[in-house]
């Protein structure tokens, strides 16, 4: 997966995080589908290719799964069940951190990625 991370992913996720934070309702909730909408809007605003947006969505879904979300793809398409915006922001922040680690690899991290 490391070779499939678009250069624009970090910026897309940061803009998405800001948008989701702003659009949360008064109860501090949002729909998972709103995260996908915000991803798409961020990508369009940055002028990136649709494939880069989809790859960034895949990174987010994998991050969500690593944080315990059983069906992240379904959550990102859901417009009926609200989730706490804190949960959405945690997913987005973790994805940003993960991409940041890829952009600034530490000594020895390549071997741990290859073996894992």
Give names to the regions the model predicted.
Residues 1-31, 92:
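Short terminal alpha-helical segments
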Residues 2-5, 65, 84:
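Position-driven detector of the extreme protein N-terminus
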Residues 3-5, 46-53, 103-106:
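Structural helix-adjacent loops and short alpha-helical linkers that scaffold large soluble proteins
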Residues 9-13, 35, 51-57, 72, ...:
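Short amphipathic alpha-helical segments that mediate assembly, nucleic-acid/protein binding
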Residues 16, 20-23, 39-46, 63, ...:
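Generic structural signal for hydrophobic core residues of well-folded globular domains
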Residues 30-41:
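Active-site nucleophilic cysteine motif
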Residues 46-80:
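Amphipathic protein-protein interaction modules
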Residues 67-116:
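Amphipathic alpha-helical binding modules
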């Amino acid at each position: 997966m490391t070779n499939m991370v678009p250069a624009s992913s970090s910026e897309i996720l940061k803009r998405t995080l800001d948008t989701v934070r702003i659009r949360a309702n008064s109860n501090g909730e949002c729909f998972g589908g709103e995260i996908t909408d915000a991803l798409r809007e961020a990508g369009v605003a940055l002028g990136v290719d649709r494939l880069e947006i989809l790859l960034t969505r895949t990174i987010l879904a994998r991050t969500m799964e690593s944080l315990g979300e059983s069906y992240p793809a379904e959550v990102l398409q859901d417009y009926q069940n609200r989730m706490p915006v804190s949960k959405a922001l945690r997913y987005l922040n973790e994805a940003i951190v993960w991409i940041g680690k890829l952009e600034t690899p530490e000594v020895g991290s390549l071997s741990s990625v290859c073996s894992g």
